[in-house]
Structure formats: structure tokens, C-alpha cells
């Protein structure tokens, strides 16, 4: 393998000082076999150990244009699998809320937020400013401030480039599995597959704390009550067992909500930390806008 990117080589050398040493070609079949085994072991170690360490710096080095194009590809593939809700009034209400939050950030990057028809109570950010919100989350929310809190949290993940960092980390591990088991298929690399990877990403405690802080900061600057995120987290905190979304159709909204909580575990300390940051006092949407958003998937539009 030949690598010419000097910044990547520098990062690789920092993570694995011995990975870039020059080796002489093997002189016998036995030597070749041993060398091949060492190479495979080194590759496995690099991807399981080196990629996680390199995920953050590699994500920071990725050009914004590349990230946006990548996110668009994943988003388009995901849309083909899960139909979008196209209610015009609801879409306008969501766009208004999104823009109100986006202008609080200095990045100026646009956000594209879409609601998808699914009972799953979840939302997640894709690279490049794309955010997927499931119908089930809007149905489970008891106020527009709860939706605003979740939306601000996911937008904060994107501002900090957490989805891209998570994909660099996760796909490094999957690449090893594909190689060892017989090849990394095109299907595994498809946008739809990557969308599923993002959907199941579980961020670290530090990453979630960062998204909480930035998300509440957005709510404060937009003068939106931040208690919505707290209410959303605490309403089902007493549930003992967290259930993931892929276990089938849920029997209740409470069970469906566990999908979101499984990737965003609240915890009493985390909720207290969020509460200490809340400063906003205003409404997220008008009563008319909230009604429109609640029925965004009910309207018959082309």
C-alpha cells in the first residue's frame, strides 16, 4: 500500500509508530507466509485500534464540501427506503423552527430537516447538515418545545461533526469484518447501509455532553424554553429496560420512545446539567404551527 497524504501519514505514525516502517521483501515462501500473517494482523490492529484514535482528526481534515456531498448521498438512499412526510403546512412550521435555531450558530451551514413516516421515536443527524426526524417522535412529543429540544440536540451533533466522526470510527471496524469474512461488498458500502450505521450510532458521554451544551445554547439564543428536552428525557426515565428500534412493532409510545433513549441515555446527572444551562423562555411554535407539524404525515400531498 502506498500513501502519499503527508497529514494522514503523520496521524498514522502518531497512532502507530511502527506501522510505517519500511520492510524488505520476503525471500522464501515461509517468509512470505509469515509476512502475510503479520500484514493481516497489522491491518486488523490498525482498523480496530488506529481508526478509532484517528477518527476525530480525520473528520476535522475532511473538507466541508466532501462531507455535504457524502451526507446528500446517504440521505437520498435513506429516503428511498423510508417515505418522507410532505405536508406543506407542517413542513413550513418545521423549516421555520430549523432556521430559528440555525441562525444562532456562527457556522452559517444550512440544515435540511425531513420527517419520515415511521412509528419509531427517534431522530438522527447525517453528515453535511441533514437531519432525519421520524413521525413517531413528533407523535410522542407533548409540546413543540420537546421537538425543538431534540432538533437542537441533533443540530448540535452536526455542528460538532459528530456523525462524520462516528462513521469514520464505525466503518473502520466494519471494513475489518468485511475483509476477514470474504470481501467488502458494494451493498455494505451503499448509502442506505451507511444510513443504518448512523441510525444505530451511540455517542460517547463526552460527545453527548457537548451536544447538550451546544443544543441548549441554541435554544437559549433563539429564546425557546429548554425544558422541552428535559421533559422528553425524564418522562420515561423510570423505564427499566431500554429497547432498540429493530425489535419490531412496539406496543406503546413509551416502548417506542426507548429507541431514542437507547442512543441518547439521559441519566439524572445529565438531566441536571441540562437544567442548569436552560435560559430560554419563549414558545418554539405557535399553536397553529404545532398542529400543522403534528399532522405533517396525515396530509395528502403529491
Language model segments and positions:
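A Zn2+-metalloprotease active-site environment signal
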Residues: 4-9, 13-302
Amino acid at each position: 500500500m502506498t500513501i502519499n497524504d503527508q497529514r494522514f501519514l503523520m496521524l498514522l505514525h502518531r497512532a502507530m509508530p511502527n506501522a510505517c516502517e519500511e520492510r524488505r521483501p520476503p525471500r522464501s515462501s515461509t517468509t512470505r507466509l509469515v509476512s502475510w500473517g503479520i500484514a493481516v494482523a497489522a491491518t486488523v490492529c490498525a482498523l480496530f485500534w488506529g481508526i478509532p484514535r484517528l477518527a476525530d482528526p480525520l473528520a476535522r481534515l475532511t473538507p466541508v464540501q466532501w462531507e455535504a456531498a457524502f451526507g446528500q448521498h446517504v440521505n437520498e438512499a435513506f429516503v428511498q427506503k423510508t417515505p418522507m412526510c410532505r405536508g406543506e403546512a407542517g413542513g413550513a412550521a418545521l423549516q421555520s423552527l430549523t432556521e430559528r435555531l440555525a441562525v444562532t450558530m456562527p457556522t452559517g451551514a444550512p440544515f435540511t430537516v425531513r420527517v419520515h413516516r415511521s412509528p419509531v421515536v427517534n431522530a438522527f443527524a447525517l453528515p453535511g447538515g441533514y437531519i432525519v426526524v421520524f413521525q413517531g417522535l413528533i407523535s410522542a412529543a407533548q409540546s413543540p418545545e420537546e421537538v425543538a429540544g431534540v432538533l437542537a440536540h441533533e443540530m448540535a451533533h452536526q455542528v460538532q461533526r459528530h456523525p462524520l466522526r462516528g462513521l469514520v470510527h464505525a466503518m473502520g471496524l466494519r471494513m475489518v469484518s468485511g475483509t476477514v469474512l470474504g470481501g467488502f461488498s458494494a451493498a455494505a458500502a451503499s448509502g442506505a447501509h451507511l444510513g443504518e450505521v448512523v441510525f444505530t450510532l451511540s455517542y460517547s458521554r463526552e460527545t453527548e455532553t457537548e451536544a447538550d451544551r451546544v443544543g441548549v445554547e441554541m435554544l437559549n439564543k433563539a429564546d425557546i424554553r429548554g425544558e422541552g428536552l428535559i421533559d422528553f428525557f425524564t418522562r420515561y426515565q423510570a423505564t427499566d429496560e431500554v429497547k432498540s428500534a429493530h425489535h419490531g412493532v412496539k406496543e406503546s409510545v413509551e416502548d417506542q420512545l426507548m429507541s431514542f433513549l437507547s442512543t441518547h441515555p439521559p441519566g439524572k446527572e445529565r438531566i441536571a446539567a441540562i437544567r442548569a444551562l436552560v435560559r430560554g423562555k419563549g414558545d418554539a411554535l405557535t399553536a397553529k404551527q404545532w398542529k400543522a407539524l403534528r399532522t405533517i404525515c396525515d396530509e395528502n400531498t403529491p
